[in-house]
Amino acid sequence: MNEISTIVDGDRMTSLQIAEITGKAHKDIMRAIRNMEPAWEKVQERKFALMQEEIEISNGGHKMRPYYSLNKEECLYIATKFNDEARAKLIKRWKE
């Protein structure tokens, strides 16, 4: 999963990176973000940045994989859903 860190620059973090850092499944991170987005949008008047990347699948074909690209504020908002250890890992990553 080393390619994940190259998706965005240091000012943003992807849902893929969040999954890797916290040890959670990416689909669970995506679900948490989708569930929290309506409240965020109501207060901040903007949605999270939903992106896609093309990935190769086992049969040699390709498919598009969705992911979110979040700034620090958005990322820390999402982290409120995590357990203490996962949240601490995410905060540590932002300090690096």
Model-inferred region functions:
Residues 1-96:
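An anion-engaging/catalytic patch
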